């Protein structure tokens, strides 16, 4: 059980709170909500592939290709984010997202165009998330990073609810398949343009003093290896693929009317739990947050495996939302915190890259399982993978107490000579 809320200290006093939750935070909050709204409209991507003549296995391969390119981009040019700053890189990623969403409307059959469009869309999307997380982390003290990442992430839940319900409404009211996808993916591109404007407003006065060029991502990764948290990041990628990519086809196969019930319940649950557990990183620590988040995915995906009615999505969504509320901020904070502050952009991109790598590894596997053994086997597989990872990471949590909680208790920062977070000490090589 978590310990009682941390008493009011210099680190969470009203003055400190007002400094953290100022104009920068709320503009970033609006931007992230807009991004998730646009992305939620693309949850019907598997339906688009099916409309173009593809199967779930084809969907898995397309998703894996887009993810593979995104991972390569992260690892090869992630240092550019530190060198040039979010003010330059963030708008570029947003424009790539817009181009990708618009390009989904070009092909009339399953051609190379859909592969290129998926690459552009996903590279842009992952870059936008990396810029957003890097930007907000650089505006708060180290001991508040997990809290601020979690609270910023809560902004996306409104967008997820609205976007998934719009998707269901479009499919229900618009009979023509082609028109459905024009509305969904064209709408995502238009929302991406709105996001671009918000990002420009958010970063236009942001200075970025040039320092020595950051080392390449591979060198940083070997020097400041984040540890076992990369396994949890990969399971996050598995969870994203199992729900955001394949749930729509699962609902269709089960003759369930839409996926809005799942994503609405998921978003509401994650938002509520994110508020309820916002101080857990400073009480039970991020390692145990991560274990509990993984267990949420274990139960949630197991429940999805046996869903036959729309309301069966609700209990699964609540448990999955709980898992996401804990897992995402803990993974990003632990992973990026292993890197020095001057390399925080690269560190954030790298740990999110392991999430993408999880999608890359598991998307074709899940697609193959669906084609040969069905959706029930696929969701039981994803649940089992999360369970194995949770058990393995529990050993880490038991043997490596999180020093973010220790710092909060001591009321003094505790960083090593590189300025990195010592919640799980990186390995220097």
Model-identified regions with their sequence ranges:
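Juxtamembrane intracellular "pre-TM" segments in multi-pass secondary transporters
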Residues: 7-21, 203-231, 413-419, 423-424
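Residue-level signature of mid-helix packing/kink "hotspots" within the transmembrane helices
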Residues: 40, 67-75, 160-161, 267-275, ...
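Cytoplasmic helix-loop-helix junction between adjacent transmembrane helices
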Residues: 119-155
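Helix-loop boundary and gating motifs at the non-cytosolic
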Residues: 18-67, 229-232, 240-250
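C-terminal ends and interior cores of transmembrane alpha-helices
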Residues: 95-109, 296-308
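Helix-to-loop junctions at the C-terminal end of transmembrane segments
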Residues: 73-85, 273-285, 370-371
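C-terminal membrane-cytosol helix-exit motif in multi-pass small-molecule transporters
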Residues: 168, 189-209, 392-397
């Amino acid at each position: 059980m978590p310990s009682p809320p941390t008493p009011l200290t210099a680190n969470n006093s009203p003055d400190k709170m007002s400094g953290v939750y100022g104009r920068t935070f709320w503009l970033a909050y609006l931007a992230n909500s807009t991004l998730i709204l646009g992305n939620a409209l693309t949850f019907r991507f598997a339906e688009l592939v099916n409309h173009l003549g593809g199967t779930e296995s084809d969907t898995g391969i397309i998703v894996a290709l887009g993810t593979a390119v995104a991972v390569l981009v992260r690892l090869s040019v992630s240092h550019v984010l530190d060198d040039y700053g979010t003010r330059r890189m963030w708008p570029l990623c947003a424009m790539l997202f817009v181009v990708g969403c618009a390009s989904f409307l070009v092909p009339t059959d399953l051609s190379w165009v859909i592969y290129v469009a998926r690459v552009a869309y996903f590279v842009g999307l992952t870059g936008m998330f990396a810029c957003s997380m890097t930007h907000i982390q650089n505006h708060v003290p180290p001991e508040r990073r997990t809290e601020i990442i979690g609270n910023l992430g809560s902004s996306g839940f409104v967008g997820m609810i609205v976007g998934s319900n719009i998707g269901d409404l479009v499919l229900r009211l618009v009979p023509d398949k082609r028109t459905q996808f024009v509305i969904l993916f064209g709408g995502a591109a238009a929302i991406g343009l709105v996001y671009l404007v918000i990002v420009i407003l958010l970063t236009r006065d942001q200075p970025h003093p040039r320092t020595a060029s950051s080392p390449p991502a591979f060198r940083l990764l070997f020097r400041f290896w984040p540890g076992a948290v990369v396994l949890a990041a990969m399971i996050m990628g598995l969870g994203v693929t199992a729900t955001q990519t394949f749930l729509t086809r699962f609902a269709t196969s089960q003759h369930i009317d839409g996926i809005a019930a799942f994503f609405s319940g998921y978003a509401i649950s994650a938002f509520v739990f994110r508020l309820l557990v916002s101080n857990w990183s400073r009480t039970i620590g991020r390692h145990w947050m991560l274990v509990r988040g993984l267990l949420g995915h274990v139960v949630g995906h197991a429940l999805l495996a046996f869903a036959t009615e729309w309301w069966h999505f609700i209990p699964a969504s609540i448990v999955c939302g709980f898992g996401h509320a804990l897992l995402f901020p803990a993974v990003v904070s632990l992973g990026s915190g292993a890197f020095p502050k001057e390399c925080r952009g690269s560190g954030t991109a790298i740990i999110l890259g392991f999430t993408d790598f999880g999608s890359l590894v598991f998307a074709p596997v899940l697609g193959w399982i669906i084609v040969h053994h069905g959706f029930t086997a696929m969701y039981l597989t994803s649940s089992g993978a999360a369970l194995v990872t949770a058990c393995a990471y529990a050993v880490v949590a038991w043997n490596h107490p999180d020093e973010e909680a220790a710092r909060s208790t001591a009321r003094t920062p505790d960083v090593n000579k590189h300025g990195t977070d010592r919640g799980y000490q990186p390995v220097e090589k």
